[in-house]
């Protein structure tokens, strides 16, 4: 048995432990001396990299992309828009370190301008394997070390496996970015095992986690911009598998202005004081806009708000929120998930159109119809409201 008393460390173990520290001290001195002898430009570059400084030129490139997407709108999945955005980001800076939990082809996380990490060569992309929690834990370590902003991809449904790592990133205020694709019943035939229902709500419930769910290509660029700016916690991008129409081409906003930073903003309105305000995120914004167009023809007074980040909206000052929430007689929320978390907007007389059961297998358009998340449902609710 052990011959030592409680909390007594054997001398040989102490010696071994301290020898590791002494070796580390020597290596640290060698490294610091080398850095001090380096040219000022090298020292600045190293300091900027360690502190994860993003040069303004990166955001300028994103503004160029945003302007292009507004001028030539595309109907694409937001996961594809994210890939386009990442190519611009990975081209403009060496600070990003990507990866995926064996879903690279589906998450669209690897761009052609970065190479995988290997034993033989430096790279900026990690194939984590089917290990979502390990991916999250490794990204936390990368962020804590400094020098890189890690981003990793998986399906939104598998965020449950990442949850402890996401929570720790939030607790430690670490900048870690998750690319969570296949974000609703819109993923289609993979069925209820892969269709997230409660995930958006449960992730939003974690303090200091920013959940972004863009509804178009332009919003995807803006959400990536906010994720890069968010230095004090994890950012999660929930992205669609199905194509979504662009709705920002006709909105009179300067290309440099990012309305997503407010969490919610008006994308369509036919009245300063409408009967109904409809709030939606992600793919459901397209559905709501279709309903709005029909309701306008029927002379119903309606405003439509895109809510790309409910967390950001809830963090705005009370006056800002009240001006939006209290503007209409009744608020309607449309999201292909559960209603939890939308209470501040719904209030007592609000109407929620979304999910309360597991999904099903089938073409995504059939599923939206089956679960009654359609423009017809929205129109019917408004026309039949007292």
Residue ranges, per PLM feature:
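Short coil/turn connectors at secondary-structure junctions
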Residues: 92-96, 120-124, 145-149, 172-177, ...
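Conserved acidic/glycine
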Residues: 1-131, 141, 277, 281-283, ...
